[in-house]
């Protein structure tokens, strides 16, 4: 078989940059680190309050089948008062460890298990001496195990990993 045209053209030259580099790009051979402006990257857990008085706590990226301790601060809620306690909510993935009253609000510490991929929202309820309660929704973006290790926000700490059953690593060889 003939390969017409193969090798008939000269090889093209590569792209060349001027010694000082192109605008916005470092010169070849220099370190190419990415730097973000401080105001563009907020590394703390974000707490927002909606018009109903409930809270949304965004804890950032987490890794699937890992357990995290999450600490965040809620602003003062006049309806609850100083003595706040968690209401029992049957949720195997999110449990409150402690709620501490502070002059500037309440410090909440909870344990969260990232049990599946995607944007997950888990709820917890806090109550005071009055008959009202507030709902706190913890939102996490959970990555699968093949997408690396996420940078955790301030207030989020990995405390362990759940064992994952992987059928390829099974010790059972079947019937002989």
From Swiss-Prot:
Chain intervals with Polar residues compositional bias:
20-30
In alphabetical order, the GO MF annotations are: protein phosphatase 1 binding
Region called Disordered, residue ranges:
1-30
Superkingdom: Eukaryota
**Pfam families tied to this protein:** DUF4517
Q: Which GO terms describe its cellular component?
A: extracellular space
InterPro entries, alphabetically?
A: ADISSP
Q: Which GO terms describe its biological process?
A: positive regulation of non-canonical NF-kappaB signal transduction; positive regulation of transforming growth factor beta receptor signaling pathway
Family affiliation: Belongs to the ADISSP family.
Role summary: May be involved in thermogenesis and glucose homeostasis.
Which PANTHER family does UniProt cross-reference here? Answer: ADIPOSE-SECRETED SIGNALING PROTEIN
What is this protein's name? Adipose-secreted signaling protein
- Species of provenance: Taeniopygia guttata
User: Species lineage, top-down?
Assistant: Eukaryota, Metazoa, Chordata, Craniata, Vertebrata
């Amino acid at each position: 078989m003939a390969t017409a045209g193969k090798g008939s053209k000269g090889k093209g030259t590569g792209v060349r940059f001027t010694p000082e580099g192109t605008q916005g790009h470092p010169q070849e051979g220099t370190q190419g680190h990415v730097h973000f402006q401080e105001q563009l990257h907020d590394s703390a857990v974000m707490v927002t309050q909606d018009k109903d008085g409930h809270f949304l706590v965004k804890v950032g990226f987490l890794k699937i089948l890992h357990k995290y301790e999450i600490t965040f601060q809620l602003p003062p809620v006049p309806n609850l008062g100083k003595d706040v306690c968690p209401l029992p909510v049957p949720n195997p993935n999110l449990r409150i460890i402690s709620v501490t009253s502070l002059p500037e609000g309440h410090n909440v510490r909870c344990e969260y298990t990232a049990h599946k991929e995607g944007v997950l929202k888990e709820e917890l309820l806090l109550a005071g001496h009055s008959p009202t309660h507030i709902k706190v929704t913890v939102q996490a973006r959970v990555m699968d195990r093949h997408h690396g290790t996420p940078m955790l926000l301030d207030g989020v700490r990995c405390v362990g990993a759940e064992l994952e059953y992987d059928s390829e690593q099974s010790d059972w060889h079947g019937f002989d």
